[in-house]
């Protein structure tokens, strides 16, 4: 049943043809079950393991590698001679890479499905219903409850379905619905109709929602929605409908894969076609088919060379290292790709409660009456420091600290705060923090009493556990609480009846202490406490007191105010009818006003500076809260989201104001707004959608079940460590300390990771370009193979992989949070940078071919043939006069490939040292600024010597040890790459940067 909150309870019962006393008949239950189904959230139909495995092979790069592996297997099968064993190494290594990637991918997918399943923890096992087939209340499985059932709930119960309240069987009914609405305090419910068709869930005070908890009271309601039709079920449907977006990095790598696949296809076909004339050369036994297969192998080698096989592993390692650094800053990342996405965040949509504020209600102001006569009323005003539940703080009047025990009014105010209170402070020894036990508002009063210490209790020798309630305990030893008149909506107050624990010198007897909404309490006051005496409360005094409270409640502070009062001569408790809550207001009359406290959920001290950093970094901060607009705007001003006098028109909206806008106006509002108040979960999702339509990268925080769809939809969903399992499962990141400052630290880390990632991706790609140029040149010029596929795999995965990973440890730029967020569409490599790394790659390719050629032509241990003979080596035979006196087996020597491989590895190590900074010279940013890079380079060179010297590795990699003279030549060919890159960096700093600035 939709909009049950609009109708009187009797009309809702009539709709279901049921009575509150009799309940549904068995026939009605059967009909409803057939119509609505069971009262449970269906399990998510996850993908099968096979489907998940197949998904991992949808990536274009992976498919190219898979094809290369399959072709290599086929070619290896037909190999002859000593290469039979080594031929299988290459396809096996590629397959191992693909299997490892698939395992990681499947594991991550399995984790992602837990968000929807986590919703089930909010479904109760059992429910209490009234049905006509049995007298009284019966317990049934919650899944068997149907719309129309009469359901009973009491304190401690989890609500089993969405209920329209029809009767409250206690003084009050309070419900913790924070998982659904995000409200930090429990909500008082009632049974009257709410004639507002656009009421948000927070305003539906006559409804109980499935999965929420009863914190006090007892009530009966009629089930109006079950299963997927409940508010919890709607959230489940929203989450199931959200398709996870690919991160900017994933999209860039997809695009890179497409471009690379096209380039590989063109180059491979070109190499094969260009060499058609050589298919029938004598080296192939005169067989055209064998020649075609030989050049097909070269084309496959080219594909292997062009694909940076180590890139997925290096990116994963870099992101994993980033997550460890973030975890040390209290940001726990659940999804690796989102680490990089943080770096291009342009909007942070943050909850107010607990993230921007401490979520620890704190009294920051109070007043008692100093003087009162017929014409005026003077107040003693005090400020209190401290923003958490830690019972430490200073009470000041003006600029001067005061001893509260010197003010009789403050002694009585502290007494009321301590006794008219059902909550307490507790020290959590495991966490090392003070925590509330009970309601946030009352805990703030308990904490205030500890700060005031009106009886000058010696607190020095106390442990923290004892300190939590020391001053409150002293007051409670003087007065004994007899009973409590609970809060009710009509009188907006609560009170306690107390008697002295020992005879008072003045003969003082029982008292009633009252706290509540100022207008309601002051209306029932006839006098006011001035020090230790009582004075009449005149209309002038009443108005001055209310004016001060209005000022506190509506100014820049928007404090939540509570009035405190005493009834000095209450009726005897035997004469009071405590079963009839309608009489409570009669007992809370003829009151004496004592004072007023103003409290707020204080902003976290470090947040204002973090918001300033966000603005410097070009990131817009938007507060989203369920609180009213006035409070939200006031907190925004305190935090610097709005200026002190800034006009907030068009920059702050309530959920209802937002709904009143046209779709296009809503889009524009999301582009300019910095505050949304009184919003529902659906608003959050719409805000994210609108921001995404402007290509904004949005980080969205949340902690409740209601936040899960928006967390899943946003590029970066951020859940609170204290939040629900559903929110954490739907989010990419969890803040263990619930602190906004941790988000900003994570964004900074994300930017640093992206900067480093660009360095190692370009480093790896320049290596691949060099390998492609090398193979392409040897094929075009008709030279012997300089590098074979298994060597290329070794370089791409191992020798290049270690320095590339170490580049992830590069120190971040000092101005990293002073730059605008980069566009998610910004290419990894484009324009000038593409030319730079193409130039380096071409040098790498030329150098490797030159090294192999040098051995054939110039090396003392080589055959000393000329370049023309080398180009025509495939025509070598005993009958060919061109090769007279030359052993044709020399073209199978391992020396030229070893020379080429050694030059490739050495140049790549030089490239790695050059990559500490994108544009800074090695003289300004030397390699030792990243010690891990030096270690990685040393390890890569050690591994290179390992394959040269330790059997059976030389056989597998087709290499052989080099002489000292040959190593000198390797260094002579390799080291100039440093000078080339320094020249390109110089141009980049002094010319390209100026051109980009002018643009």
Swiss-Prot record:
The entry's active site is 351 (4-aspartylphosphate intermediate)
Which ranges does the record list as Cytoplasmic topological domains? 1-48, 111-253, 314-757, 809-828, 918-930, 986-999
As for membrane topology, the entry says: Multi-pass membrane protein
The protein's matches in CDD domains, at most eight in alphabetical order, are given as: P-type_ATPase_SERCA
The name this protein goes by in its record: Sarcoplasmic/endoplasmic reticulum calcium ATPase 3
The beginning of the lineage is: Eukaryota, Metazoa, Chordata, Craniata, Vertebrata
Give me the Lumenal side stretches, as residue ranges: 70-89, 274-295, 778-787, 852-897, 950-964
PANTHER family reported for this sequence: CALCIUM-TRANSPORTING ATPASE
Which keywords annotate this record?
Acetylation, ATP-binding, Calcium, Calcium transport, Endoplasmic reticulum, Ion transport, Magnesium, Membrane, Metal-binding, Nucleotide-binding, Nucleus, Phosphoprotein, Sarcoplasmic reticulum, Translocase, Transmembrane, Transmembrane helix, Transport
- Region span, Interaction with phospholamban 1: 370-400
Protein family (similarity comment): Belongs to the cation transport ATPase (P-type) (TC 3.A.3) family. Type IIA subfamily.
Kindly list the positions at which N-acetylmethionine occurs in this protein: 1
List every stretch annotated Interaction with phospholamban 2: 788-808
Q: Which reaction does it catalyse?
A: Ca(2+)(in) + ATP + H2O = Ca(2+)(out) + ADP + phosphate + H(+)
- The PTM Phosphoserine maps to 17, 25, 662
Against Pfam families, the record matches this protein to: Cation_ATPase (PF13246), Cation_ATPase_C (PF00689), Cation_ATPase_N (PF00690), E1-E2_ATPase (PF00122), Hydrolase (PF00702)
| Residues reported to bind ATP | 353, 442, 489, 515, 560, 625-627, 678, 684, 706
Q: NCBIfam families per the record?
A: ATPase-IIA1_Ca, ATPase_P-type
Q: What does this protein do?
A: This magnesium-dependent enzyme catalyzes the hydrolysis of ATP coupled with the transport of calcium. Transports calcium ions from the cytosol into the sarcoplasmic/endoplasmic reticulum lumen. Contributes to calcium sequestration involved in muscular excitation/contraction.
- Return the SUPFAM superfamilies for the record: Calcium ATPase, transduction domain A, Calcium ATPase, transmembrane domain M, HAD-like, Metal cation-transporting ATPase, ATP-binding domain N
Q: In which residues is Ca(2+) 2 bound?
A: 304-305, 307, 309, 796, 800
Which domain of life does this protein belong to? Eukaryota
């Amino acid at each position: 049943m939709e909009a049950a909150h609009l109708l009187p309870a009797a009309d809702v019962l009539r709709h279901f043809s049921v009575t509150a006393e009799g309940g549904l008949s068995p026939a009605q239950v059967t009909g409803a079950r057939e119509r609505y189904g069971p009262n449970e959230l269906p399990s998510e139909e996850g993908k099968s393991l096979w489907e998940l495995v197949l998904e991992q092979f949808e990536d274009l790069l992976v498919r190219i590698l898979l094809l290369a592996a399959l072709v290599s297997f086929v070619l290896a099968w037909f190999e002859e001679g000593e290469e039979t064993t080594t031929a299988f190494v290459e396809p096996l290594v590629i397959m191992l890479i693909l299997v490892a990637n698939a395992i990681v991918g499947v594991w991550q997918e399995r984790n992602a499905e837990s968000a929807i399943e986590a919703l089930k923890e909010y479904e109760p096992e059992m429910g209490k219903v009234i049905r006509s087939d049995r007298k009284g209340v019966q317990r049934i499985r919650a899944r068997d409850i149907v719309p129309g059932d009469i359901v009973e709930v009491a304190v401690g119960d989890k609500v089993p379905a969405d209920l329209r309240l029809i009767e409250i069987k206690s003084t009050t009914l309070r419900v913790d619905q924070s998982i659904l609405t995000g409200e930090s305090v429990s909500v008082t419910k009632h049974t009257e109709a709410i004639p507002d068709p656009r009421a948000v869930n927070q305003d539906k005070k006559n409804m109980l929602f499935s999965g929420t908890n009863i914190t006090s009271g007892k009530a009966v309601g009629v089930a109006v929605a079950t299963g997927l039709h409940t508010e919890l079920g709607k959230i489940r449907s929203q989450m199931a409908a959200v398709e996870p977006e690919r991160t900017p990095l994933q999209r860039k790598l997809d695009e890179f894969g497409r471009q690379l696949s096209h380039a590989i296809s063109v180059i491979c076909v070109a190499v094969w076609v260009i060499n058609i004339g050589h298919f029938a050369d004598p080296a192939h036994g005169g067989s055209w088919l064998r020649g075609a297969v030989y050049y097909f192998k070269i084309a496959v080698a080219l594909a292997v060379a062009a694909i940076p096989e180590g890139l997925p592993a290096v990116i994963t390692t870099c992101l994993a290292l980033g997550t460890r650094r973030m975890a040390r800053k209290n940001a726990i990342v659940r999804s690796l790709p989102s680490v990089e996405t943080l770096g291009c965040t342009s909007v942070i949509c943050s909850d107010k409660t607990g993230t921007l504020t401490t979520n620890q209600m704190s009294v920051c102001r109070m007043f008692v009456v100093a003087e009162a006569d017929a014409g005026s009323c003077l107040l003693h005003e005090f400020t209190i420091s401290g923003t958490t539940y830690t019972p430490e703080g200073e009470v000041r009047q003006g600029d001067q600290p005061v001893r509260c025990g010197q003010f009789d009014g403050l002694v009585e105010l502290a007494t009321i705060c301590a006794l008219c209170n059902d909550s307490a402070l507790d020290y959590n020894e495991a966490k090392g923090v003070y925590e509330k036990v009970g309601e946030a508002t009352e805990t703030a009063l308990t904490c205030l009493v500890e700060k005031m210490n009106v009886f000058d209790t010696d607190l020095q020798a106390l442990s923290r556990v004892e300190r939590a309630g020391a001053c409150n305990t002293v007051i409670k030893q003087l007065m004994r609480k007899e009973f409590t008149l609970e809060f009710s909506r009509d009188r907006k107050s609560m009170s306690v009846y107390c008697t002295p624990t020992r005879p008072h010198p003045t003969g003082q007897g029982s008292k009633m202490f009252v706290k509540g909404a100022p207008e309601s309490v002051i209306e029932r006051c006839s006098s006011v406490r001035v020090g230790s005496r009582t004075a009449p409360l005149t209309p002038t005094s009443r108005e001055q007191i209310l004016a001060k409270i209005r000022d506190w409640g509506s100014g820049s502070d928007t404090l939540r105010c509570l009035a405190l009062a005493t009834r000095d001569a209450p009726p005897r408790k035997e004469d009071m009818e405590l079963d009839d809550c309608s009489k409570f207001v009669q007992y809370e009359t003829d009151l004496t006003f004592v004072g007023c406290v103003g409290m707020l959920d204080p902003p976290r001290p470090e947040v204002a500076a973090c918001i300033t950093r966000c603005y410097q970094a070009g990131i817009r901060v938007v507060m989203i809260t369920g609180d009213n607009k006035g409070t939200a705007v006031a907190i925004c001003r305190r935090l610097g989201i709005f200026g002190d006098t800034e006009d907030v028109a068009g920059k702050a909206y309530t959920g209802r104001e937002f709904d009143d806008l046209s779709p296009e106006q809503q889009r524009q509002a999301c582009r300019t707004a910095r505050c949304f108040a009184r919003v529902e979960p659906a608003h959050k999702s719409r805000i994210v959608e609108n921001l995404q339509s402007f290509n904004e990268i949005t980080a969205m925080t949340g902690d409740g079940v209601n936040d899960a769809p928006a967390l899943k939809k946003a590029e970066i969903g951020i859940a609170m460590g204290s939040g629900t399992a559903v929110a954490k499962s739907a989010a990419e990141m969890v803040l263990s300390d619930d602190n906004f400052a941790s988000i900003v630290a994570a964004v900074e880390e994300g930017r640093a990771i992206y900067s480093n990632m660009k360095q190692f991706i370009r480093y790896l790609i320049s290596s691949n370009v060099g390998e492609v140029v090398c193979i392409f040149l040897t094929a075009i010029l008709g030279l012997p193979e300089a590098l074979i596929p298994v060597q290329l795999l070794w370089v791409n995965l191992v020798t290049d992989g270690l320095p590339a990973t170490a580049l992830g440890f590069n120190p971040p730029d000092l101005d990293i949070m002073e730059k605008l967020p980069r566009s998610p569409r910004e290419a990894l490599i484009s324009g000038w940078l593409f030319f730079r790394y193409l130039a380096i790659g071409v040098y790498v390719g030329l150098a490797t071919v030159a090294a192999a050629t040098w051995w054939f032509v110039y090396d003392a241990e080589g055959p000393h043939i000329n370049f023309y003979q080398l180009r025509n080596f495939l025509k070598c035979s005993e009958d060919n006069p061109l090769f007279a006196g030359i052993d044709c087996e020399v073209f199978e020597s391992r020396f030229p490939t070893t020379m080429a491989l050694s030059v490739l590895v050495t140049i790549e190590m030089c490239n790695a040292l050059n990559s500490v900074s994108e544009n800074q010279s090695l003289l300004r940013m030397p390699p030792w600024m990243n010690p891990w890079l030096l270690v990685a380079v040393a390890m890569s060179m050690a591994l290179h010597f390992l394959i040269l010297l330790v059997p059976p590795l030389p056989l597998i990699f087709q290499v052989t040890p080099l002489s000292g003279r040959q190593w000198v030549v390797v260094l002579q060919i390799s080291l100039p790459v440093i000078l080339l890159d320094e020249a390109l960096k110089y141009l980049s700093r002094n010319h390209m940067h100026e051109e980009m600035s002018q643009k």
